[in-house]
């Protein structure tokens, strides 16, 4: 890819904003819902300027009622629209747990109905958010059939995965890490692109140990790989990117090569994503 085909460097949060803007221009069925996303531009300013550009019917400020927001979005999705909900902080996604797991996730199995809904969930610690604004709740949804879950680690993936999620006919939980918002940058392609859901990526090849991770922990893994490389230990870093559907083939291929694996995630050890992958590796 030549520099002529790249944009100026953008941050992780700007990549998310770009994806929303481009998809709203591309498809008039796409609209946004969330607390303070209109006039205020969102808690993290992802949608700043969107209200003026697209109007109040496509950028909907909502009451503080996560269950109500998601319920309304599900109804809109079932009527043919493509809502993107901003959950101001992922911690409060639990308030909409029933709507997500019992309605959005199960519609395909109950009626064969598509629910093209995206829920953006800013998650993770490292930003002085305290116990109520720093959680990683992705594990709560990991065993809910009917959902797709993504967790990008780079601006490129943040934009490409969000565009893919918006175009998908299924409900997608899009976990964006707050710590990465303005700490990392990358030059993105000028042309339209998506990152396919369900495809992991080897961010660093290695021969000794497979380190499997996602989100902000990818950067910690790459730092660790550089340090261990000086001691002669060659780490392979696998970025899951999509948690559901899980790219088992990429995981298995890496572990077959190295015969050793480390699972790294920012979450509870018990019942987390890492525990499930560990079980899969043990079984297979």
Predicted regions and their residues:
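Thiamine diphosphate
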Residues: 1-175, 180, ...
